[in-house]
Amino acid sequence: MKEALSSFDVTAVVKELQRYVDWNLDKVYQPTREHLILALKSRGEGKEFINFFVGKWLFRSTKTKEMPQQPTDFAMMLRKRVSNARLTGVRQQGFERIIVLTLEKDGKYELVLELFAEGNVVLVKDGIIIQPLISRTWKHRVVRARREFAFPPPIPDPSEMDQGAIMEMMKASDADIVRTLATRMNLGGRYSEEACARLGIDPHR
């Protein structure tokens, strides 16, 4: 199992999750603080599960282990707000390691799943944070209940960068090539090493 998903991995995962559009969110479980399970159901397909490990990875399954009888406060909040909501959209925020699930019930909600750094889960309605799993404050961003939600500053999307922009980014970095690709372009270590190998470039230059 990979330690964390790269932005490329998130793009692939989002494509897989499109199958759940128009399914209903049946229930939310939180077996541990870092593990959130979304149970989705469809009349024609039965029930399946999205397993989200905060800040690390996400996968879908058709089975899950027995859940704790007493839900956490965060799971209870999500059940109250979005149980039986219809999943109307799944998208990646730019090239970020962020997945946004759009849910409709008594209005439109967004469940934001963050896979970067320590990660987070944030429920948003009409641009206002209902509740985050973890409240945080940065210089450029505040994630707290009843505050306006903002995504982190965007990272470059390599598909939208020309050769000149990539070269400028490389020149401005103090790190070696592989670390620059992994962190500044969010490619992750494995894809950065692969890119250097295919181009015949020393990754540690």
Predicted regions and their residues:
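Phosphate/anion-contacting hairpin/loop surfaces
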Residues: 2-3, 7, 20, 43-205
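N-terminal-proximal low-complexity accessory segments that begin disordered
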Residues: 5-41, 45
